[in-house]
Design a protein with these regions (language model features):
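A structural signal for multi-pass alpha-helical bundles of membrane permease subunits
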Residues: 2-284
Length: 284
């Protein structure tokens, strides 16, 4: 069996590699080339050098979207992981009954599409704002920001909770018992035993939270649409609006340049996070 796998593994890998090439590598290379071009359709693209990148980086809307996205991604990542870990810790207690029901309830929002969630929360938040006499989301950038935070927490906490539960349950019970024998409190056991052994799980959850935060699009489109005056427009929505909503032959190329910058930014931040958290993982 082992010899057969060694002999035929390239054949089994071929469909996956082909799908990856067709679905990612080729489009990325083509998109990278188009970021240096001016075009309406790709068949009439002509090379303009780094002009698209200069105009993208000098676009004030792109700068506003960048800082808004960074603030959103940082805050949502922290809150998602803290809340998800707290819930996971509570649901892995042996004394708690009906944990499977709670896990299902917390996970269910993750199954709802982002566009649907965006419109649902837009209605809920606007009703709340109107009841207290505040401006609606379309005129209230602070409400839009916190609305996106709340929506994202509601959708993603349950998913991260499941991952944290799996991580907590994989910690050998001998470690916990040894800590109790040594007289460690529950808080000390959590910080000195569970957290170090959870670092691989934390690495995964932080990676997912950061990437999800930066590439958020459909919830942003449905909840705020970037209003008011593009102040709640995240990077993905800014790229979309640049490519499809701005009139003029040059904007498609500028939108493509923004997409390349966005991709490089997310990859760089994710790699830094992976390196930082993996260095703290405990070797079993």
């Amino acid at each position: 069996m082992g010899k057969a796998l060694k002999r035929w593994w390239p054949l089994f890998m071929l469909p996956t590699c082909l799908a990856f090439m067709i679905g990612f590598v080729i489009p990325f290379i083509q998109g990278f080339y188009l970021s240096f071009c001016q075009f309406i359709i790709i068949s009439n693209a002509h090379f303009v050098g780094i002009e698209n990148y200069v105009r993208a980086l000098s676009d004030p809307q792109f700068s506003t979207s960048f800082f808004f996205t960074v603030a959103f991604a940082f805050l949502s990542t922290v809150l998602i992981n803290v809340i998800a870990l707290a819930i996971a810790q509570a649901l892995t207690r042996k004394a708690l009954k009906g944990t499977n029901i709670f896990r299902t309830i917390f996970f269910m929002p993750n199954l709802i599409g982002g566009i649907v969630l965006g419109y649902i929360w837009q209605i809920l938040i606007n009703c709340l704002l109107s009841n207290v006499g505040a401006q609606l989301i379309a005129l209230n950038s602070a409400a839009g920001f916190w609305g996106l935070i709340i929506l994202t927490l509601w959708q993603q906490v349950g998913y991260m909770m499941i991952i944290y539960i799996a991580g907590l349950q994989s910690i050998p019970s001998d470690y916990i018992e040894a800590a109790k024998v040594d007289g460690a409190t529950a808080w000390q056991t959590f910080w000195k035993v569970k957290i170090p052994n959870l670092m691989p799980t934390i690495t995964t959850c932080l990676f997912l939270s950061i990437t999800n935060g930066f590439k958020l699009f459909d919830q942003n489109l449905a909840l705020t649409g970037g209003a008011p005056a593009h102040s709640t427009e995240m990077l993905a929505l800014n790229i979309y609006n640049t490519f499809y909503s701005r009139a003029g032959i040059a904007w498609q190329g500028i939108g493509q340049a923004k997409a390349v910058i966005f991709c490089i930014l997310v990859v760089a931040i994710s790699m830094i996070q992976l390196k930082a958290t993996r260095s703290k993982e405990v070797q079993q």
